[in-house]
Amino acid sequence: MINISTSPRQTLDWTALKPADGSPAVEWRISDSPVPYPEAVATMEARAAAIAAGEATELVWLLEHPPLYTAGTSGHASDLLEERFPLFTTGRGGQLTYHGPGQRVAYVMLDLKRRRPDVRAYVAALEQWIIATLDAFNIRGERREDRVGVWVRRPDKGVGYEDKIAAIGVRLKRWVSLHGIAINVEPDLSHFKAIVPCGISDPRYGVTSLVDLGLPVVMTDVDIALRAAFENIFGETRAAAPAGI
């Protein structure tokens, strides 16, 4: 039975996402070179199928993509304002977003049957993972019930202004999660202007990054914070083997 919580995400018990004691550690992989989107999706789909079949352990895969746009299951063609980069349709939830160098994408392949088969609790846990990661850099990230993702307040821009610093888009297949999160570390923010990001056209809601907020961070700093925060929420990790996914 599919379990979908109806409570506000901020009240959900995301701590229940840890697996039972004695479960294998989650593999933690980092790709140093940009990964083409079709290649990433094919690899992710294959790994998720292997996890569902009991033939592979869970995996978190950190990477960057070359510049591109993706349209989720709620995407609208009208939200693509300029055809700057390739556009890929994808099975994740959500609308249009940008991926490119300087953005840390984390594809998360977890078996929620072994954890907690609850879509909203899982999304809340992903949000908490991002919030805890940002906290390591003294950035206060916040969730919004009407806007999935993580936001930072921008009083310097005006009353009620907020910028999105991280996006979330997920898909579940046989209760194994696919896709995941994207945190803006130092991407070219002008590339977001070619789309209506996540369908949000309100001028009070923009896009930002850690570097845009004045943080002198590099991707390695973010990766360290991501792993520590992940383990607090989802459990133990281990470095993936050098070859293969």
From Swiss-Prot:
In the UniProt record, the gene name given for this protein reads lipB
Question: Can you tell me which family this protein belongs to?
Answer: Belongs to the LipB family.
Keyword Magnesium found: no
Compartments annotated for it: namely: Cytoplasm
Site note Lowers pKa of active site Cys, residues = K164
User: HAMAP family, from UniProt?
Assistant: LipB
Q: In which pathway does it act?
A: Protein modification; protein lipoylation via endogenous pathway; protein N(6)-(lipoyl)lysine from octanoyl-[acyl-carrier-protein]: step 1/2
Disulfide connectivity for this sequence is: none
**Mind listing the UniProt keywords for this protein, alphabetically?**
Acyltransferase, Cytoplasm, Transferase
Example GO molecular function: lipoyl(octanoyl) transferase activity
The protein's name is Octanoyltransferase
A further note on this protein reads: In the reaction, the free carboxyl group of octanoic acid is attached via an amide linkage to the epsilon-amino group of a specific lysine residue of lipoyl domains of lipoate-dependent enzymes.
Gene Ontology CC terms: cytoplasm
The protein's matches in Pfam families, at most eight in alphabetical order, are given as: LplA-B_cat
- Report the catalytic activity: octanoyl-[ACP] + L-lysyl-[protein] = N(6)-octanoyl-L-lysyl-[protein] + holo-[ACP] + H(+)
- List GO BP terms, alphabetically: protein modification process
Residues given in the record as substrate binding sites: R92, G93, G94, Q95, L96, T97, Y98, H99, A167, I168, G169, G180, I181, A182
Write down the species.
Rhodopseudomonas palustris (strain ATCC BAA-98 / CGA009)
